A protein has these predicted regions:
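Structural preference for solvent-exposed beta-strand-turn elements
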Residues: 1-114
Length: 114
């Protein structure tokens, strides 16, 4: 998966989607946000009772699906400078770049997301 988008739009989507994420769950994928890059970028949070999906305008260069821990992903994006965020993943290893900042985090298999 590879895409780029504005930091402010991504941060707002993460904040909205995180409202439906379980802070502690027996299913680890429920502590994360499902990212789906296709014709657009979709972020989904779900806690077995409530689900929230947001769509972010993004330049999708490579389609894919991945789950990232909501808290860590949100903290990273919040601390990025106001610029274009570039996101690239391969085999669940995610690289997030924005300005002079760069982070590498591990995602999880989207098949585990309900």
């Amino acid at each position: 998966m590879k895409f780029s988008c504005e930091k402010a739009l991504l941060q707002a989507a993460i904040s909205t989607t995180s409202r439906a994420v379980s802070p502690k769950s027996s299913i680890p994928a429920l502590e994360g946000i499902l990212l789906e890059a296709g014709s657009d970028l979709r972020l989904t949070g779900y806690n077995l009772e409530t689900g929230i999906r947001t769509i972010v305008p993004a330049d999708i260069r490579e389609e894919g699906t991945l789950v990232l821990g909501a808290r860590l992903f949100g903290e990273i994006v919040r601390k990025l400078p106001d610029d274009i965020v570039t996101f690239q993943s391969e085999n669940y290893m995610v690289n997030i770049k924005c300005g002079m900042s760069e982070f590498n985090i591990l995602g999880t298999d989207p098949e585990e997301f309900p």
